[in-house]
Amino acid sequence: MSAHDLKLEEIVNPETLRRKLNELADSTDENYTSPTVRKVVLQALKDALVRGRANAEGMLMKDGGGTLCAKRLSFLMDTLIEALFEFATTKAYPMINPSKAENMAIVAVGGYGRGGLAPGSDIDLLFLLPYKQTPWGEQVVEYMLYMLWDMGLKVGHSTRNIDECIRLSREDMTIRTAILDARFLTGNRELFKTLVTRFDEEIVKDTGPEFIQAKLAERDQRHRKAGETRYLVEPNVKEGKGGQRDLHTLFWITKYFYRVKTKEELVKLGVLSRAELKLFNKAEDFLWAVRCHMHFATLKAEERLSFDIQPEIAQRLGYTAHPGQNYVERFMKHYFLVAKDVGDLTRIISAALEEQQAKHVPGFNRIFLTFSRRKRKLSADGDFVSENHRINIARPEVFKEDPVNIIRLFHLADKHGLEFHPEAMQSLTRSLKLINSDLRENPEANKLFLEILTSPRNPELILRRMNESGVLGKFIPDFGKIVAMMQFNMYHHYTVDEHLLRCIAVLSEIEHGELENEHPLSNHLITTVKRDRNLLYVALLLHDIAKGRPEDHSVAGARIARRLGPRLGLTPTETETVEWLVREHLTMSMVAQSRDLNDRKTIIDFADTVQTMERLKLLLILTVCDIKAVGPGVWNGWKGQLLRTLFYETELVLTGGFSELSRADRDHQAREALADRLSDWPKDKRDAYLALHYTNYFLTVSLEDQVRHAHFIREADRNERALATMAKPHTFEAVTEITVLAPDHPRLLSIITGACAAAGANIVDAQIFTTGDGRALDTILISREFDTDDDERRRAERVGKVIEDVLSGKAHLPDVLAKRTKPKRAAKAFKVEPRVEINNTLSNKFTVIEVEGLDRPGLLSELTGLISDLSLDIASAHITTFGEKVIDSFYVTDLVGHKISNATRQGNIRRKLLGVLSGENGSKTNGRSSQAAA
């Protein structure tokens, strides 16, 4: 990279800056260390810093060069520090006849030492001394540091002599790494040369394995902290997996082990090919560009690429929308592909290190065994060998001789439970061009792939290796299109390909009985569909494969399934089942969460879609895997209960047992089960309590929750409390349940949801029930905030207190809610087109109003309040939150119990609800609500 490319003269002119500092200092008769002189010198340095950064940002916007920007900012800092040091040693604290001890070198270390800086990066300096610190040295260091701090810079610093540097770097790996990146700035160059020579001879020499072990352990710990996967949709660009620090780690260990200074030397040594060096530089340039833009845009050292800044960074980088993908999603896909490239480079360098005697050191996520290599043939033709519990190729030409060996490598690794040898993965990466249409249509290759996908061992692990190596996306091109694809919303935590792999992992866990307690129904059903288990794995791999296209991904995905099924060896009937599962993969979740499961028509319509028990079982298991794999906290026990209820109700229809008698029988059994758990109650009290609840309560609420509710209501009655709340944290589901007992009235739901918003609680779900004596029993699920149950319970009790205060009139809802009307920071980044649908076909008795819009504090309260104002009764409400988006369904009638059939009235309802969703005039919250009996 030439000075011409950098255009450093547009950043700062070193000679002009030094001359200006001297002129400013000489323009006054005061001492050079006086406050007046210090002030003008500081201002000149600040001006140069601001001007240089502004020019660097402008050049970044123009040429897009991330590495160029980082080097320009580093040059700017070099110039400021060199000018400041010269001023400090020639003007402020000059030495006429310095002793040997009275000199120093200013050395850039750490990230700054590598010659690249982001706008908000720390400036790490080593004040290098020949011997002990002197009074003169203390004055210079102090003067420089305070000036740099007053410029608003974050400066990390150490003052050491050479002996101390050597001793400490021997003891402390962080210091050793910092000195590894040391770069001379100004001062006594001979001091710096001595340090470098001694460091290389006394520290680096013969300690390569030790250093590699430490840096890889440090990397693994960093990944655990930042998130193990490189496909988190809000990645940490600096510290996350596949981020900038991973590139730094790769260069550190190669620089240390091979004792090189530049990446280019690794090509000469055969560690990297020229293409791989180009990949390294491209990844580095992109990550620098993203990070510099983030710092410039936020005016701080922001390292997390969060939702709220992704749109601006994408615009700064020049991304535009394509059909099916907006500009943010295209930018983030590029980001994740770069993160994947970093993973590829990790494997390549790992192979080279092991080849160069690093095999006794913990490698990349596994141990290089210390005993000598023992090879064992894995295939009859001798193409593959087992080497220290890792699969390797027997010779370099294995993939070229027979491209099916590319798939066979993974099949054998799964069959024998082997890890992958770095040499095999390096050769594989360089053989991806062999995956062509002939291999894709090869029957044996597809048979092997299906066996990998449906392996009874750990299919997710092997598929992940196939994906990381690029094989999966090449072998199934439609999968390749969704690799690294993110969806710009707060609901999906991972990229699409990562989500699909996690779905496979969940299914495998269910099949192995590992999730019996959490998913009891799926755990049972999986044993009854063994004949079709392969179809589940195929459907899960394909269910989101058409994401990012202009059309409905379920419909497009079904077409892909129809095309791929025969290729994978499925029969026409099996292919049809997979196609159906992909097309309907969202249906069961949608019906369970946003429809009234106590409405007979809901069940009949769903049964008409499913048609057979076999499909019902498969769809239930697929739905559980899909929701579970979306991300932490998305699955919760209530969603499981809703899915189980829908399954059992539909089962009755499909098996011919759906009748009021069967429903009544199940109601009777549920009442008997609760009565048995309340056997210590007096019989009259027990019977009276059981009579309080309607059938839908017993068919929807789990027995354990029924018992809790019984004791809760009994305690409230004993204390003559008409109004009471109860909190229960759910640790695993990352939600907290608040149960509210209150006199029922039409505006209760609006008041409760408004009070939750006022208390800062984010509602993720709600259940609404009424009792026979005119009371409401409402259960609200809110997002968890604290790690410990005790802290979370106290917080939930505070939320419950706000609800009680508002319901009792002690607090005025509009007043307390007004303080909490700011939407979540991340939600501001999203746009959700408001939607209102009014449907009279989903229920025989009720009109179903379904609304969709951007979530905000108090929205549910506003919606239910408006519905009440429109003279509508809510029979049931079903609240579903998908990240920043809400989809709420209300089963309503007019005040005399009829559906809303008048088109003019429907239009008025739709218009006013759209106003609330858009935040327009209809969105004033005043605690209004309407009856919400499930």
Curated annotation (Swiss-Prot):
Cofactors that this protein relies on: Mg(2+)
Stored Gene3D superfamilies: 3.30.70.260, Beta Polymerase, domain 2, cca-adding enzyme, domain 2
Catalytic activity: [protein-PII]-L-tyrosine + UTP = [protein-PII]-uridylyl-L-tyrosine + diphosphate; [protein-PII]-uridylyl-L-tyrosine + H2O = [protein-PII]-L-tyrosine + UMP + H(+)
A GO molecular-function descriptor: phosphoric diester hydrolase activity
Keywords of this entry: Hydrolase, Magnesium, Multifunctional enzyme, Nucleotidyltransferase, Repeat, Transferase
Ranges where the record places region Uridylyl-removing: 380-736
Keyword Membrane attached: no
Any one Gene Ontology BP term: regulation of nitrogen utilization
A family per Pfam: GlnD_UR_UTase
Enzyme Commission number(s): 2.7.7.59, 3.1.4.-
Region (Uridylyltransferase), start-end ranges: 1-379
Domain of life the protein comes from: Bacteria
Domain HD: 496-613
Domain ACT residues, every copy: 737-819, 848-931
Regulation of its function: Uridylyltransferase (UTase) activity is inhibited by glutamine, while glutamine activates uridylyl-removing (UR) activity.
Function of the molecule: Modifies, by uridylylation and deuridylylation, the PII regulatory proteins (GlnB and homologs), in response to the nitrogen status of the cell that GlnD senses through the glutamine level. Under low glutamine levels, catalyzes the conversion of the PII proteins and UTP to PII-UMP and PPi, while under higher glutamine levels, GlnD hydrolyzes PII-UMP to PII and UMP (deuridylylation). Thus, controls uridylylation state and activity of the PII proteins, and plays an important role in the regulation of nitrogen assimilation and metabolism.
Family: Belongs to the GlnD family.
Domain remark from Swiss-Prot or TrEMBL: Has four distinct domains: an N-terminal nucleotidyltransferase (NT) domain responsible for UTase activity, a central HD domain that encodes UR activity, and two C-terminal ACT domains that seem to have a role in glutamine sensing.
Protein name (database record): Bifunctional uridylyltransferase/uridylyl-removing enzyme
Species for this entry: Brucella anthropi (strain ATCC 49188 / DSM 6882 / CCUG 24695 / JCM 21032 / LMG 3331 / NBRC 15819 / NCTC 12168 / Alc 37) (Ochrobactrum anthropi)
